[in-house]
Amino acid sequence: MSDETRDAAPGRRDGYRVWALPGLPEVQSGDDLAKLIAAAEPALADGDVLLVTSKIVSKAEGRVVEAADREAAIDAETVRVVARRGPLRIVENRQGLVMAAAGVDASNTPAGTVLLLPEDPDASARGIREGLRDTLGVDVGVIVTDTFGRPWRAGLTDVAIGAAGVRVLDDLRGGTDAYGNPLGATVVATADELAAAGDLVKGKAAGLPVAVLRGLPQVVAEDDGEGARAMVRGARDDMFRLGTSEAVRQAVTQRRTVRAFTDEPVDPGAVRRAVAAAVTAPAPHHTTPWRFVLLESGESRTRLLDAMRDAWIADLRRDGKSEESVAKRVRRGDVLRNAPYLVVPCLVMDGSHTYGDVRRDAAEREMFVVATGAGVQNLLVALAGERLGSAWVSSTMFCRDVVREVLGLPDGWDPMGAVAVGHPAEEPKARPERDAEAFIEVR
């Protein structure tokens, strides 16, 4: 591409042409796609963009595999399941793409076989670009396309899964719009727009797997560029990394006991949302046996923990523990002291029944204790959903009178431990899966 063309390109708004290439033969393993494309369109020019359907790239690269069981092929290409609806799976595949069936396709391929996506679509695009440069002496952009569904939208469209020589993203952040308003979040997915334009002329069943787009030389780069991988947003940065049902299931199991926190303040609103989840727990007799005391000030936390420490030391000394042993045990309370936020859950027996015998009265209290535990578990799970770490510690149960006195609580409020809350100092470790069968008896 000449310097004159490159200099003029950014200001061009004259429109563009896009057309499909007829006459391409059925692609076989080992075929040179660049030579096939050059033969079909020898008049390619600098600044053109080639839009190449991934199916023919896969065929040329020998990505057609025998697979009587398509589901097994999908399993092999899957890194994680994002969502599942009946037989349909939306997954992240080994290329980092989130798509239906990991890109495994049983169409346009002989019976008993499936097409896998190219192993490295960016490398595939680079190879085609280099081949066209060698064959025709032209400097073009190449995009490998595949068909995707889209969140919140019906229907399918083509997007870029591989690219070479194309400015795949147009980052407008830091600029202004026509009214002078700052652009703070606008990054245009140029390669996807080009892929969709090509799909208009290629179609889905017309046997036209390659399109040429001409008239937008500003999107073609001198070097190969970052490729389409630069467009893939990682799961950690994705606000919707799981489907609804999958997110609900994961939320229940992602709670961890977190004992070390950063100094980042805890959003009181997040804790209140967790409390709102806590009080949806089951409870006997249509009661609401939960109360949650939120210690939001450092002064209230220190006052409570100092009083609890003194009560604990007194208990340990009565047990005959040495001063060294006492000091060692008391240090275990640091998880509460180092937390930037504490919640003290309490049990109230309002609405409980009195039966007049020890057995049934004990069972009645146990029902309320179980309900309180369910509320605390809801709290912990909801805090995890707010990306907050937590640790339930039993210590307030051993000095309830002290806790009630320091916090000014009614006599009928029974503290049921304390929950340390904060932003985890490090990513919680993955928990090994437990086999449910080890905890089940069937009758």
Swiss-Prot record:
Which BP terms from GO are recorded? F420-0 metabolic process
Annotated binding of FMN, by residue: 283, 394, 431
| Region annotation (Coenzyme F420:L-glutamate ligase) ranges | 1-243
Name the residues that bind a divalent metal cation 2: 147
Residues at which GTP binds? 24-27, 54, 59, 108
Swiss-Prot/TrEMBL keywords: GTP-binding, Ligase, Magnesium, Manganese, Metal-binding, Multifunctional enzyme, Nucleotide-binding, Oxidoreductase, Potassium
Q: What name has this protein been given in UniProt?
A: Bifunctional F420 biosynthesis protein FbiB
Species this chain originates from: Streptomyces coelicolor (strain ATCC BAA-471 / A3(2) / M145)
